[in-house]
Amino acid sequence: MSRISKAEMSRLLSVYFIMGSNNCTKDPLQILKDALEGGITIFQFREKGEGALTGEERICFAKELQAICKEYGVPFIVNDDVELALELDADGVHVGQEDEGITSVREKMGDKIIGVSTHTIEEARWAIENGADYLGVGPIFPTSTKKDTKAVQGTKGLAHFREQGITIPIVGIGGISIENTASVIEAGADGVSVISAISLAESAYESTKQLVEEVSKKGTSHKY
């Protein structure tokens, strides 16, 4: 197995759905199925914060979500927890700046997908040099889902990454909705990552379809 290509990674980032049980008011398994039917291209399991499952319950829930992703041939990524990602043989892991260092993560994960949250050009360059396959850049807009977020960067912050020569695939993170998706792609992102825009939507299926439409309308400006 070899590392994922930039072109394939870019395609997978189009509509990146992140969810845990506490991000939903309806059955999370059904929400994931509806989102997959609607066209999400990659899924991240993020079970943390108030009311999150722990221990065996968390692992069982992750396995259920992973099985659904497999049915649809969509990569299943684990947020922060490298050990869980290895235990589940997940397709990859996403880490933040406060989590396990990228060099150690790459050693453990082999050629699997690794995404890194970055807020500065220095963090981005370090992540790329040490094996990141994609960057999560944000928060682009204000968000209520994550309580420990950094300062809002806006689409200008995202565009700055491209202006400074950051050429690997980027997914925009934070406060992204159907209405502002186009501006995130225009600023240089390959795709958008969302939680509540799908998990709390009246119809996860319809919401996902609209996000897919917005991303494909703009098309990424990067040729890998």
UniProtKB/Swiss-Prot annotation:
Pathway: Cofactor biosynthesis; thiamine diphosphate biosynthesis; thiamine phosphate from 4-amino-2-methyl-5-diphosphomethylpyrimidine and 4-methyl-5-(2-phosphoethyl)-thiazole: step 1/1. It is an enzyme of class 2 (transferase). One of its GO terms (biological process) is thiamine diphosphate biosynthetic process. Mg(2+) binds at residues 80, 99. SUPFAM superfamilies: Thiamin phosphate synthase (SSF51391). One of its GO terms (molecular function) is magnesium ion binding. 2-[(2R,5Z)-2-carboxy-4-methylthiazol-5(2H)-ylidene]ethyl phosphate binds at residues 143-145, 175, 195-196. Binds 1 Mg(2+) ion per subunit. Keywords: Magnesium, Metal-binding, Thiamine biosynthesis, Transferase. GO terms for cellular component: cytoplasm. It catalyses: 2-[(2R,5Z)-2-carboxy-4-methylthiazol-5(2H)-ylidene]ethyl phosphate + 4-amino-2-methyl-5-(diphosphooxymethyl)pyrimidine + 2 H(+) = thiamine phosphate + CO2 + diphosphate; 2-(2-carboxy-4-methylthiazol-5-yl)ethyl phosphate + 4-amino-2-methyl-5-(diphosphooxymethyl)pyrimidine + 2 H(+) = thiamine phosphate + CO2 + diphosphate; 4-methyl-5-(2-phosphooxyethyl)-thiazole + 4-amino-2-methyl-5-(diphosphooxymethyl)pyrimidine + H(+) = thiamine phosphate + diphosphate. Its EC number is 2.5.1.3. Its cofactor is Mg(2+). InterPro entries: Aldolase_TIM, ThiamineP_synth_sf, ThiamineP_synth_TenI, TMP_synthase. 4-amino-2-methyl-5-(diphosphooxymethyl)pyrimidine binds at residues 44-48, 79, 117, 146. Condenses 4-methyl-5-(beta-hydroxyethyl)thiazole monophosphate (THZ-P) and 2-methyl-4-amino-5-hydroxymethyl pyrimidine pyrophosphate (HMP-PP) to form thiamine monophosphate (TMP). PANTHER family: THIAMINE-PHOSPHATE PYROPHOSPHORYLASE, THIAMINE-PHOSPHATE SYNTHASE. HAMAP family: TMP_synthase. Belongs to the thiamine-phosphate synthase family. This is Thiamine-phosphate synthase. It comes from Bacillus cereus (strain ATCC 10987 / NRS 248).
